[in-house]
Amino acid sequence: MDWPIMQIQSLLLKPMFKMKSLLVAGLMMSGFVFGQRINSDTLKVAHDDGLIVYANKPYPLSKKGQVFAFFGWNRGAFSNSDIHFTGNGYDFQLNNVSARDRPTKLGIVYIDPSWFTVVQYNFRAGYFIKDNLALVLGIDHMKYVMNQNQTVDFSGTISDPKYAAMVQNGQVNLADEQFLTFEHTDGLNYENLGLEKYKNLVHKKNVDLIWSYGAGLGFMFPKSNVKLFGNDRSDRFHVAGMGTDLRSSLNLVFWNHWMIRAEAKAGYINMWDIKTTLNNKPDKARQDFVFGQVLAGIGYTFNTKKYN
């Protein structure tokens, strides 16, 4: 009678040994997996209850609370515009006036802090108000110079016979600078606030490539250099109008902090209160035009939130 019982016990114990072997192997494997070193892109956060949670380290230019600052240099282009002048004894418009930017010759001025306002520069300071969305404060210091060697269409009236005589067949030649010199070279300052959306395109060790796009709105604060009819040159800062833009950029970020930025933007500027005299007379000009801009420079980004 004992032999059948031993056979039954043997049949029951074999599966139990197999299950125990599988359980031990599973525990060993789990110990191996959970005992691995946490990836360098993860963060360990300790809570008050003593529980430790591992979370992915945020990519640069992606997370709410991140900040960046940027300084760079630009080239600009402007559409032709109609410029309307009003003042004591005149009310006229010059049509289809062309203009260009005025980049500073490459040299030490581009890296000398005491001369940084001489060049066409850009400044950005951004704060991520939510993941992948930043509120960006910007200063675009462009330079706008009316092309002097041009003949433009004229419409309106001038009471001074000397300058009225310069209008021939409904046109005026600006080449000799006696009638008008007109520029915003200190500069065409566009102070703007924008919203920018960011997307990480490439994430490698110590290098990220990030694309952004957005729009901005702001006011124009030019220092306009205008000399009309031989009057004293107007050369002062003044809030003259408003601007708006669309922009897109590529950002290379190294070691999660240092960044190189290249940006293109297009926008519209309307200035209805350009001062044309040094005094407080009501003399002024107004113009509107479309602009394009490309810029590049360097910056730095960091997290405001501390991680343990």
Q: Which residue stretches match the model-derived regions?
A:
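Predominantly the C-terminal beta-signal and adjacent terminal strand-loop region
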Residues: 81-84, 90, 249, 253-308
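Short glycine/proline- and aromatic-enriched beta-strand/turn motifs that initiate or cap beta-hairpins
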Residues: 37-127, 293-295, 299-307
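Residues that define the transmembrane beta-barrel architecture of outer-membrane proteins
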Residues: 63-67, 117-121, 185-191, 209, ...
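Gram-negative (and chloroplast) outer-membrane scaffold detector with strong preference
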Residues: 60-65, 124-227, 299-304
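Outer-membrane beta-barrel translocator domains and adjoining extracellular loop/strand segments
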Residues: 81-87, 148-154, 223-232, 273-281
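Flexible, solvent-exposed coil segments and beta strand-coil junctions
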Residues: 98-106, 169-177, 224-230, 274-279
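Extracellular loop and loop/strand-boundary signature of outer-membrane beta-barrel proteins
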Residues: 55-57, 108-111, 177-183, 228-237, ...
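Bacterial Sec-dependent N-terminal signal peptides
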Residues: 1-44, 308
